Regions:
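Short phosphate-coordinating micro-motif centered on Lys-Gly-acidic
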Residues: 50-57
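Residue-level marker for the onset of beta-strands and adjacent loop->beta junctions
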Residues: 39-41, 67, 79, 105
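Short loop/turn microsegments at loop-to-beta-strand junctions
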Residues: 40, 58-59
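Cyclic-nucleotide recognition modules
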Residues: 80-141
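Glycine- and acidic-residue-biased ligand/ion/polar-headgroup-sensing regions
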Residues: 59-77, 84-87
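Cyclic nucleotide-binding regulatory module and flanking cytosolic helices
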Residues: 1-49, 87-89, 94-99
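Polybasic "coupling" helices that flank or enter modular domains
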Residues: 133-180
Length: 180
């Protein structure tokens, strides 16, 4: 039986940030934005400001039109993922609310740059997605997000500190000058 070593796995794969930009399902995002933007409430969030996915009335789906934000866990503030426009956020939290998942994960957003977008109520999101038959596009976006998380985990889980710092430096170097 041959054992495969994964020690240098990071040497032979595309970095998660570069992968996330190249694999982004633009057609699915465009279809979702086209149908949902008219139902969203516009927002602008400045760098360092938090944006809640929850209001007293509803959970919100965020359509990020410009900027970069971090998705953070509400319980510990742990940064889960950085998201670059165009993108969506709030699908996981909305699923938890819709299906009353006990001890569901909750998240909030922190703007890394000025962020502009629209916040769509969960009720409007479900209604429009049903009426416009957009669930395939939602599934494509969620599959994309899972792939990005998988690639990112390969860089961060089970590796030494050097490889984690190296992955972060590669990511920062790949950013556009204005985002860096």
């Amino acid at each position: 039986m041959k054992l495969t070593s994964f020690e240098n796995d990071n040497e032979n794969v595309l970095h998660s940030y570069i992968f996330s930009q190249q694999a982004k399902p633009h057609a699915a995002i465009d279809a979702l934005f086209s149908a949902l933007l008219p139902f969203g409430k516009p927002f602008i969030v400045q760098p360092g400001e938090e944006f809640s996915l929850y209001t007293e009335q509803s959970t919100r789906i965020v359509l990020l039109e410009s900027g970069i934000f971090s998705i953070c866990r509400s319980d510990r503030g742990l940064n889960v993922l950085s998201v670059f426009a165009p993108s969506l956020a709030g699908l996981i939290d909305s699923y938890g609310v819709t299906y009353d998942v006990p001890t569901r994960p909750e998240h909030f957003l922190i703007a890394e740059t000025e962020c502009r977008g629209r916040a769509v109520s969960l009720a409007d999101f479900i209604k429009v997605t049903d009426e416009c038959n957009l669930w395939h596009d939602v599934a494509r976006f969620l599959a994309y997000r899972l792939m990005v998380m998988n690639v990112r985990d390969r860089e961060l889980v089970g590796v030494d500190s050097y490889l984690k710092v190296r992955a972060l430096l590669i990511e920062i170097a790949a950013y556009n000058d204005e985002d860096r």
